[in-house]
């Protein structure tokens, strides 16, 4: 049995430390704004004219800011298993950097297991393999305390009259909220 070499699916975006992988972003030397993936041309802060950046390791943990599922296979160059298996995606807020980073959620954790505010940590997982290599990417994994908190949030949502799986508006109020937004824009 030969062992395949683990390599990053995308070079330079994260470390391959199995115990404590880190996303590699950049930080503007003028204003301190973080970016991921690394910025090399101009600062993403619209009030800054900075064009010099330092590599910046980003936080390994964060909280779910938003999430969804990928029911349809992403287009090439994405390498998917055959047959395609849907997966959850999470936009994770990194508090120290004041930014949100998108990534897949580990297999076995779906949208029903997530909620806004779920604590997650960065891990490495295989995206695909060939004869010689195992190509890895970062993924988000809920921490040990997340399932109980997720159940509490779902229970609270049901008590507030929210639809199962929808964290945004109580049943019957979606149209009302949209009308208010449209009315405000006309003024």
Per-region residue spans from a language model:
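Short, conserved beta-turn/loop elements at beta-strand boundaries and strand-helix junctions
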Residues: 67-73, 127
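Cys/His-rich short segments
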Residues: 18-59
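Short, intrinsically disordered C-terminal tails of secreted or membrane-associated proteins
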Residues: 181-185
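OB-fold (S1/OB) nucleic-acid-binding surfaces
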Residues: 81-100
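Conserved hydrophobic positions within beta-strands
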Residues: 62-64, 105
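Well-ordered alpha/beta subsegment
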Residues: 98-152
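A broadly conserved sequence feature marking short terminus-proximal activation segments
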Residues: 1-27, 137-141
């Amino acid at each position: 049995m030969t062992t395949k070499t683990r390599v990053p699916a995308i070079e330079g975006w994260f470390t391959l430390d199995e115990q404590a992988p880190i996303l590699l972003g950049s930080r503007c030397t003028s204003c301190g704004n973080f970016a991921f993936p690394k910025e090399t041309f101009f600062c993403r802060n619209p009030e800054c004219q900075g064009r010099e950046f330092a590599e910046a390791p980003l936080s390994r943990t964060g909280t779910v800011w938003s999430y969804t599922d990928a029911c349809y296979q992403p287009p090439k160059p994405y390498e998917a298993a055959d047959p395609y298996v849907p997966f959850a995606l999470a936009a994770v807020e990194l508090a120290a950097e004041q930014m949100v980073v998108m990534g897949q959620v580990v297999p076995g954790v779906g949208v029903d297991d997530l909620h806004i505010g779920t604590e997650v940590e960065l891990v490495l997982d295989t995206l695909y393999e060939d004869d010689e290599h195992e190509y890895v990417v970062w993924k988000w994994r809920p921490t040990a305390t997340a399932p109980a908190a997720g159940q509490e949030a779902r229970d609270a949502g049901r008590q507030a009259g929210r639809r199962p799986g929808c964290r945004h508006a109580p049943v019957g109020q979606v149209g009302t909220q949209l009308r208010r937004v449209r009315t405000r824009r006309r003024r």
